From Swiss-Prot:
Gene: Atp5pf
Molecular function per GO: protein-containing complex binding; proton transmembrane transporter activity
Family membership noted in the UniProt record: Belongs to the eukaryotic ATPase subunit F6 family.
Subunit (UniProt): Component of the ATP synthase complex composed at least of ATP5F1A/subunit alpha, ATP5F1B/subunit beta, ATP5MC1/subunit c (homooctomer), MT-ATP6/subunit a, MT-ATP8/subunit 8, ATP5ME/subunit e, ATP5MF/subunit f, ATP5MG/subunit g, ATP5MK/subunit k, ATP5MJ/subunit j, ATP5F1C/subunit gamma, ATP5F1D/subunit delta, ATP5F1E/subunit epsilon, ATP5PF/subunit F6, ATP5PB/subunit b, ATP5PD/subunit d, ATP5PO/subunit OSCP.
Taxonomic path: Eukaryota, Metazoa, Chordata, Craniata, Vertebrata
Keyword set includes RNA-binding: no
Residues that bear Phosphoserine: 108
Protein name from the UniProt record: ATP synthase peripheral stalk subunit F6, mitochondrial
Source organism per UniProt: Rattus norvegicus (Rat)
């Protein structure tokens, strides 16, 4: 009986979510079709151009050799500061269990 209630509740939730999503998709489609003013259009064009350059170069755009030297210098500082480990993965820790002395309880 509870399984039937769960299935009924899940179907009600699924239909409510689908109606909500349909409404939101309809509203966003109208919002994205509006015309942009010229300044917004230029701004978006520049962002898209920058993204294309960044993807083509595979890294930062419009940087010289000074930038790469600075990055290398900072990475060297980090390696010196944090133990010269691999910077791309999480470090592994080895914790040893503490050794306790067993003390005899004095009998009274």
């Amino acid at each position: 009986m509870t399984v039937q209630r769960i299935f009924r509740l899940s179907s009600v939730l699924r239909s409510a979510v689908s109606v909500h999503l349909r409404r939101n998709i309809g509203v966003t489609a109208v919002a994205f079709n509006k015309e942009l003013d010229p300044v917004q259009k230029l701004f978006l064009d520049k962002i898209r151009e920058y993204k294309a350059k960044r993807l083509a170069s595979g890294g930062p755009v419009d940087t010289g050799p000074e930038y790469q030297q600075e990055v290398d210098r900072e990475l060297f500082k980090l390696k010196q500061m944090y133990g010269k480990g691999e910077m791309d993965k999480f470090p592994t820790f080895n914790f040893e269990d503490p050794k306790f002395e067993v003390l005899d309880k004095p009998q009274s």
